[in-house]
Amino acid sequence: METLSQDSLLECQICFNYYSPRRRPKLLDCKHTCCSVCLQQMRTSQKDVRCPWCRGITKLPPGFSVSQLPDDPEVLAVIAIPHTSEHTPVFIKLPSNGCYMLPLPISKERTLLPGDMGCRLLPGSQQKSLTVVTIPAEQQPLQGGAPPEAVEEEPDRRGVVKSSTWSGVCTVILVACVLVFLLGIVLHNMSCISKRFTVISCG
């Protein structure tokens, strides 16, 4: 239940959008909280802001904007805490011609945990391990030259590219052979049909 109440603290209970810099959690005089976008929409239709839950009125002086209402400190505290249960989905194209959603583990010290199993969502026996390599900023390819890790992994990449290219070539050759075989059958049948109507000479 704690997760549900914590999740409900993270989103506006009117529009069910998560709080963000654009949708700030604003505290009304009655101590209820909703996002600044919903409050702005309520303000356009009314002079004062009326709480949708208790109908309490929050008076705003003339020229006073909804953005000038105080932010809810409890909600800001919950938003500021990193949640270990949240993962950003990353799509990685694997050599097995599949695209899978992989939740990458997150740590406070390092962005990614190297050597962790990343492919937990693969079906059955198709589990594959994913090793994450953290490259220092000064060695990244955009800033000149390939990093040493990339140079070491280059033969592996070439092998994967060669094997996928070879399997593609084999597939094309196999399909071409099947089509030639079927064409031969069709032509043979057509020649047999045309022989039925020819006049056989006797003699």
UniProtKB/Swiss-Prot annotation:
It comes from the Eukaryota. Ubiquitinated. Autoubiquitinated in vitro, leading to its degradation by the proteasome. PROSITE patterns: ZF_RING_2. The keyword Metal-binding applies. One of its GO terms (cellular component) is lysosomal membrane. Its EC number is 2.3.2.27. Gene3D superfamilies: Zinc/RING finger domain, C3HC4 (zinc finger) (3.30.40.10). InterPro entries: RING_RNF152, RNF152_C, Znf_RING, Znf_RING/FYVE/PHD. The chain crosses the membrane at residues 167-187. It catalyses: S-ubiquitinyl-[E2 ubiquitin-conjugating enzyme]-L-cysteine + [acceptor protein]-L-lysine = [E2 ubiquitin-conjugating enzyme]-L-cysteine + N(6)-ubiquitinyl-[acceptor protein]-L-lysine. Keywords: Apoptosis, Lysosome, Membrane, Metal-binding, Transferase, Transmembrane, Transmembrane helix, Ubl conjugation, Ubl conjugation pathway, Zinc, Zinc-finger. Residues 139-158 are annotated as: Disordered. GO terms for molecular function: small GTPase binding; ubiquitin protein ligase activity; ubiquitin-protein transferase activity; zinc ion binding. Its main location: membrane. Belongs to the RNF152 family. E3 ubiquitin-protein ligase that acts as a negative regulator of mTORC1 signaling by mediating ubiquitination of RagA/RRAGA and RHEB. Catalyzes 'Lys-63'-linked polyubiquitination of RagA/RRAGA in response to amino acid starvation, thereby regulating mTORC1 signaling. Also mediates monoubiquitination of RHEB, promoting its association with the TSC-TBC complex and subsequent inhibition. Also mediates 'Lys-48'-linked polyubiquitination of target proteins and their subsequent targeting to the proteasome for degradation. Induces apoptosis when overexpressed. This is E3 ubiquitin-protein ligase RNF152. It comes from Mus musculus (Mouse). The lineage of its organism: Eukaryota, Metazoa, Chordata, Craniata, Vertebrata. The gene is Rnf152.
